[in-house]
Amino acid sequence: MSDQPPPYTPLPLLSSFPPNPYPDQTPDPASTPTLVLPNPAFPNKRKRTGFRRKLPSGSPAAPVAVAASPSAQPPPRASAADDIIVINREPTAEAVTALTAGFPADSLTDEEIEAGVVSDVGGIEQVNYILIRNHLLTRWRETFNSWLAKESFATLIPPHCDHLLNAAYSFLVSHGHINFGVAPAIKERIPKEPTRHNTVIVVGAGLAGLAAARQLVAFGFKVVVLEGRKRCGGRVYTKKMEGGGRSAAGDLGGSVLTGTFGNPLGIVAKQLGLPMHKIRDKCPLYRPDGSPVDPEVDKKVEGTFNKLLDKSSLLRASMGDVAMDVSLGAALETLRQTDGDLSTDQEMNLFNWHLANLEYANAGLLSKLSLAFWDQDDPYDMVGDHCFLPGGNGRLVQSLAENVPIVYERTVHTIRYGGDGVQVVVNGGQVYEGDMALCTVPLGVLKNGGVKFVPELPQRKLDSIKRLGFGLLNKVAMLFPHVFWSTDLDTFGHLTEDPSHRGEFFLFYSYATVAGGPLLMALVAGEAAHNFETTPPTDAVSSVLKILRGIYEPQGIEVPDPLQSVCTRWGTDSFSLGSYSHVAVGASGDDYDILAESVGDGRLFFAGEATTRRYPATMHGAFISGLREAANITLHANARAAKSKVEKGPSTNTQACAALLMDLFRQPDLEFGSFSVIFGGQASDPKSPAILKVELGGPRKKGATEGGKADQHHSNKLLFQQLQSHFNQQQQLYVYTLLSRQQAMELREVRGGDEMRLHYLCEKLGVKLVGRKGLGPGADAVIASIKAERNSSRTKTRPSKLKIGIPKSKS
């Protein structure tokens, strides 16, 4: 089944608008305003000078004209035009704004439908809701430095649509589409103290983690962010370089805002008052000997490259599902041999340069990219200029991290999650407990098993982690005494003769206009990026200087030695293990969705660029995913609170439940050491519920120690020290937990005494021991069912049954 996006069409919503909302004004078809925006179906990855996937373009190809048609008719309903509200005179322009913000201009998103924003999907109510939603989005984009108050729209919205205004406003705020960012008016709304009892642990202080944490703090949650590095930002890292009285700020990771129209990071930059430098289209290429590439040859080869990409699209369409098992590289090589028309060495070198650029755009080898889905996100490219941020993207990171509680140098190695909350274990054994956790670690770390999940993640999520690709891009940043390269361009490229080295310093970024100093960045992509990981920095810098001197010294321009150089090693960075994600052979866009799914009944959530199907491998994708998960966490917290409120009704008698539990444990179904278990459900079902009681303190029971080996394991884990200390106290303490029949049977088989069983229970099974009150309403239902089953069994005559495990002592 093909995963290709449907053909792009003009906004069908316009057919729902009344023919003329202003009957006293007759529109002139010739003067009807037409909005032109780039066709989202055009594959931008093939262009020359972009960051990751989104590349700057001079004039958009295949423009889509969006205009309000004077002959458009309302839905087939009597007096429909009278029912459709009129907010302003430019509904079409506002529909385009919604489109650039990631909304369908004429329909609801799945999230809006799930939120129940309208009672009649597809009716007039939906049309009015969309008009209100689009208007709110447009107003927010115009007034991003102010808090957008719902009350300011009261006079615009008819009273019978107040519920739609409430629904649209609530949805847009809670999902981070409006009233987000770092403007003073937004920050003033953040509560000084938490207003909720829920604690959320955010793992990772990259853009996803910071976006989520900032939203959650604004929503009133208790939040703590755990970051393994000494800095925030993750794969967005602005390095200050200094030497010889010069200084400059260079982005060693994410560096380009890819499309500013609709990009939420563009809004954050505007809130900070930061000017954005549009990356200019000019990108001259130089041959291996340093001479300029013939413009006519350049044009011919670029046309051939684009033609082969078009043919690869036709090829995958004809192959159907088989295309999922074929790489883009294999398809392009086959097509090159049959339709390439590349006859000279210069043409082949140019073609290989374009292949290197494609590998750069996807952070993956072409031999690994899926022919079927490598460009599945192209329809969602952000519209607008591609820009550098003066001073680096670290300025965005620092503003987002302001007043967010971040604990640095805390490397997370275990995340336990269950029905009663989460535990996050960091280096040194320190444990952070919370109600929910958000994991934002890069896909490379997940692939490498850098974080252990207890219980293990669902198999479908593990499979998606394995299928998706995580590639590599490296850079060499060089601060020079002065600018010796052309100042009328932001990029230039260099060709290589060896195809296996085609990505080696193939593209240069000039940061002289935005870094505060003469800074030049050389990019290393594809196979060369992997080889670069083990290249000595001095050798790398020497190779770059050789290229630069080959280009400029024949022009009579001296190339000085750099004052400072930095080589990245993202592939061996333990906190990233790569650069960004791509759709590998065998994977699809569905895998991004699966990675985004929460687990543990709304206890553990996931964010990051590899969890967004629409915007993978981008900075704004990471940021948007953080806003998304802040909304999901809030929804689950609200649902859990509502459920708890219902279940904790006046009929609940805590003392009666406690007494009943004590009575049931007088005849446990299973007993070993200081552990006893009562079972609910059917004995044949290994997943049936059970309640475990652990007796801490008091006299030891038979089986409490085995083989005399328990002492050597005592206190190995900081997590268990407090529990284990109770064994040496005089008073008795009972703690409980819910688990399955199968888990209880596994626990019985653990050797090494009660200490090892405690270790297995908490470390392997990931459960949390609590007092009677901590069991919660779920356990009350199990207790009641066990009592009912036992009462029923007493009415029947049957032989006495032996208990499994160590029998109780006879009196």
From Swiss-Prot:
Record region (Disordered): 1-79, 790-811
Keyword line: Chromatin regulator, FAD, Flavoprotein, Oxidoreductase
EC number(s) per entry: 1.-.-.-
Statement: the UniProt record of this protein carries the keyword Oxidoreductase: yes
Amino acid composition bias (Low complexity), ranges on this chain: 56-71
Residues involved in FAD binding: 227, 229, 235, 609
Class in the EC hierarchy, top level: oxidoreductase
Domain of life: Eukaryota
Cited Pfam families: Amino_oxidase (PF01593), SWIRM (PF04433)
GO-annotated biological processes: chromatin organization; spermine catabolic process; thermospermine catabolic process
Spans through the membrane: none
Segments of skewed composition (Pro residues): 1-10
Its biological purpose: Probable histone demethylase.
Family the entry assigns: Belongs to the flavin monoamine oxidase family.
Protein name: Lysine-specific histone demethylase 1 homolog 3
Species lineage: Eukaryota, Viridiplantae, Streptophyta, Embryophyta, Tracheophyta
